[in-house]
Curated annotation (Swiss-Prot):
Protein name: Acetyl-coenzyme A carboxylase carboxyl transferase subunit alpha
Pathways involved: Lipid metabolism; malonyl-CoA biosynthesis; malonyl-CoA from acetyl-CoA: step 1/1
One GO cellular component term noted in the UniProt record for this chain: acetyl-CoA carboxylase complex
Subunit-level organization: Acetyl-CoA carboxylase is a heterohexamer composed of biotin carboxyl carrier protein (AccB), biotin carboxylase (AccC) and two subunits each of ACCase subunit alpha (AccA) and ACCase subunit beta (AccD).
Record organism: Helicobacter pylori (strain P12)
SS bond partners: none
Subcellular location field: Cytoplasm
Amino acid sequence: MAIYLDFENHIKEIQNEIELALIRGDEDAKEILEKRLEKEVKSIYSNLTDFQKLQLARHPDRPYAMDYIDLILKDKYEVFGDRHYNDDKAIVCFIGKIDNVPVVVIGEEKGRGTKNKLLRNFGMPNPCGYRKALKMAKFAEKFNLPILMLVDTAGAYPGIGAEERGQSEAIAKNLQEFASLKVPTISVIIGEGGSGGALAIAVADKLAMMEYSIFSVISPEGCAAILWDDPSKTEVAIKAMKITPRDLKEAGLIDDIILEPSKGAHRDKFSAANTIKEYFLDALRTIQQDPHFLDNRYQKLMSLGSFVEGMN
């Protein structure tokens, strides 16, 4: 059963009316209602607030990394373990083909259903997850395979055990190593891009965001609690933090925005998956045609956060 957010109530009502018209066999009413639905969807989704976009990024029906991997990766083979400690189920690693192009895919997976969410630790990786990702990145480099990374996490796991096993070191090591990989790297934020937990697999030649995803240094709720001691100021925090694709593209922090189906990726995961596939293939061709892509990646990374002071 489809889950509708509070701002989608009118869409839900029209959808229910369409289903009733189908039961009655009333094709004329169905056609009229479908036109109303299309108009309503366009009206709502063209005027979304940043808070509503955050709700979409966290939508329980939103496609996760495994959904996209199952749809776009063929002849896939999953690889486990970090060769140091354990296998972290919050990070998934695959070898496979996208349109006959051999690739390595690394993704952060939140899981569906209580048991799977617990198995995946709600998509919050431990150090062994980031080390598994690095192991696969080095494998890709050795065999000259491009890398697709799918980012979707509220953040790296903040537990005591994770800190004892070097959470910050694992993330920092990934930032360092991914910056110098000698193969094309493409990262897509598909839902939540939470702080260092996202950055650990977001250093790439091309960094894109799905239209209704977010990328932030802290959750808006956490920001509101720290700055105003009031979690109810989440919407104020969102505006101040500039976490939407549009804001980040304007700031030069991401390269591209991947458009979603009219009602979001959660309403049509097949179209969303195909869009990601086409983006990956187009970006890969662009990178492969550039003999200086490593230098360009370095220059892009070094330019982040730079500024020029005004002259008096």
